[in-house]
Regions:
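Generic short alpha-helical segment signal, independent of protein family or function
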Residues: 12-15, 29
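Helix N-cap / loop-to-helix initiation motif
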Residues: 3, 15-20, 52
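Short amphipathic recognition helices of helix-turn-helix/homeodomain-type DNA-binding modules
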Residues: 20-51, 57, 61-69
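Short, basic-rich loop-to-helix N-cap that marks the start of a DNA-contacting helix
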Residues: 1-13
Length: 69
């Protein structure tokens, strides 16, 4: 099955809502985004702001977190 980052990138690119993204992560047997995890909370913010994958990666990099790959 696809990696967690691939699923998240695809969901961002498709502009899916956060609940749809959580469902996609579950269906692909990947862990859901968890707000108490710093990187995940940045990703949750990106979904809320409808950021692109590129803008999300810029934000992750600025926050010293691994970019989506």
């Amino acid at each position: 099955s696809p990696s967690r980052d691939k699923v998240i990138s695809l969901c961002l690119a498709l502009k899916l809502e956060f609940p749809e993204t959580q469902r996609a992560l579950t269906l692909t047997k990947n862990g859901q985004l968890y707000s108490k995890n710093k990187r995940d909370s940045i990703l949750i913010f990106a979904f809320g702001k409808k950021l692109s994958v590129i803008d999300t990666n810029v934000l992750l990099e600025e926050m010293n977190e691994p970019v989506l790959n």
